[in-house]
Each structure stands twice: as C-alpha cells, then as structure tokens.
C-alpha cells in the first residue's frame, strides 16, 4: 500500500529554502567574481623598488686617533651631492612635449579599351558588326592627421636605489596625496648623471635618462573613468 505523508506548511517552506541555497550561493559567487573583474589592476611603469635604505656602517671603533673608520657621516671637504645608495635627490619635473603628424595619399588610374571586328562574306550575316569596348577608372584619396600635447610640471624627491659602475645613479621615488577620498600619487624613476646635479641637490627631469613618470589616482573619480566589465565584454565580442 502506498503511503502519502503531507508535511506541514512551515516544513515545506524550509525544505524549499534549503533547496534554493546552493543555487543562490553559486549566483552570489559568480557575481563576486565578475565584480572582481570590474577593476583591472594597473601595473606601475616606474622601476621598482621605489626606495632603498643605506647599508649599515661598520661598528664604531675608538683607536684614539683622528681618523675613525666607523664614522658614518660625510667627510669634511665633500659636497652634499648624492652618490650612495639611500641618498635623496630632488627631481624638477618640467616636461613639455608636442607632436604633430599628417599624411595623405591620392591615386587616380583610368583605362579605355576598344576592339572593332569587321565582318565580310558569309560572316556578315552572323556577326553583322561587332564592336567591343571597355572602360575603367579607379580613384583613391585619403588624408590623416594626429596631434598630441603633454605638459607636466612639479617636483618630487627620490632615493638613490643603485649606483652603476660608471658612477651614474639609479633613482626612484613616489609621492602620495589623499584628497577628498581620492588617493593621488606621482612616481618617478630614471638614471641620473651626478655631473648634472645642481648645488641645490636637484636635477631637471629632461636631464634624466630612461625617465619614467607616472601620475595616477585611486578613488571614485578614477573608477568613474574606467569602463565596466560588462561593457568591456560586449565591446570585445561585438563584430562592429
């Protein structure tokens, strides 16, 4: 005999809710995964690391003479220009770049062909008069242009992270500013010739080799300028 058992209404609701939980959990996990793809992390273009600590000086000794090998300061008759790992240097950013490019192309070709077939005798009734002619023309014209202007002025203090065998200094540093819930930062890295450093312990960015300057931000404004993950998805698969 087949038995049918009816569950109370609260029990049926609880069982239905339990059956829906795995699907809801999977949907929530998928939503979180897609939300994580909404913001693509931007890798810095500057050379890492951004700072370096000077090496530890040797242990202090007291031999009783004027010369002390454990002295970590600068010599008396030495200038204050950076020359060791951990020294700091001020970079005066003065970048002004203008670029203009224009191009054009023009092509024109024409052709004309005519072929007459005279007929005589018994061929006259078959072909009568046959005139063959063909004409063709091909014309192409295109123009293009592009222009760009970039200006960046400011100052940033960097740290010597390495000293090359020829004496050039590898510098790198960053400056962060938190303004109205937006974190803005400036990063700089490059190779400096010590001979170009001024008496104020500064050098222009135009005199730095392999200079890499980055100005970016993190916050609501930066997120508003970023395309959403769903829009990027349809942009990649759209055929037009």
Swiss-Prot record:
Q: Which UniProt keywords apply?
A: Bacterial flagellum, Cell outer membrane, Membrane, Signal
Q: Name one GO biological process term.
A: bacterial-type flagellum-dependent cell motility
Q: Could you tell me which Pfam families the record lists for this protein?
A: FlgH
Coiled-coil parts of chain: none
The record's disulfide annotation reads none
Its function, per the record, reads:
Assembles around the rod to form the L-ring and probably protects the motor/basal body from shearing forces during rotation.
Q: What NCBIfam families does this protein map onto? A: PRK12697.1
Per UniProt, subunit arrangement is: The basal body constitutes a major portion of the flagellar organelle and consists of four rings (L,P,S, and M) mounted on a central rod.
Name of the molecule in the record: Flagellar L-ring protein
Q: Which organism is it from?
A: Burkholderia pseudomallei (strain K96243)
């Amino acid at each position: 005999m087949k038995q049918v058992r009816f569950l109370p209404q609260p029990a049926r609701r609880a069982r239905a809710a339990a059956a829906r939980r795995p699907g809801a959990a999977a949907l929530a996990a998928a939503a979180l995964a897609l939300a994580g793809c909404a913001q693509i992390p931007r890798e810095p273009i500057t050379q890492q690391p951004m700072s370096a600590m000077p090496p530890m000086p040797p242990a202090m000794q007291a031999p009783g003479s004027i010369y002390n090998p454990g002295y970590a300061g600068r010599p008396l008759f030495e200038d204050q220009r950076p020359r060791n790992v951990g020294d700091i240097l001020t970079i005066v950013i003065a970048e002004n770049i203008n670029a203009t490019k224009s191009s054009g192309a023009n092509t024109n070709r024409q052709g004309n062909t005519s072929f007459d077939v005279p007929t005589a005798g018994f061929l006259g009734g078959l072909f009568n008069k046959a005139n063959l002619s063909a004409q063709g023309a091909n014309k192409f014209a295109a123009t293009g242009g592009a222009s760009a202007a970039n200006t960046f002025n400011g100052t940033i203090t960097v740290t010597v992270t390495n000293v090359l065998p020829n004496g050039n200094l590898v510098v790198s540093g960053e400056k962060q500013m938190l303004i109205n819930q937006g974190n803005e930062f400036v990063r700089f890295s490059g190779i400096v010739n010590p001979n170009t450093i001024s008496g104020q312990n500064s050098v222009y960015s135009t005199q730095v080799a392999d200079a890499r300057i980055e100005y970016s931000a993190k916050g609501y404004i930066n997120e508003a300028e970023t395309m959403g993950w769903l829009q990027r998805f349809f942009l990649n698969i759209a055929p037009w």
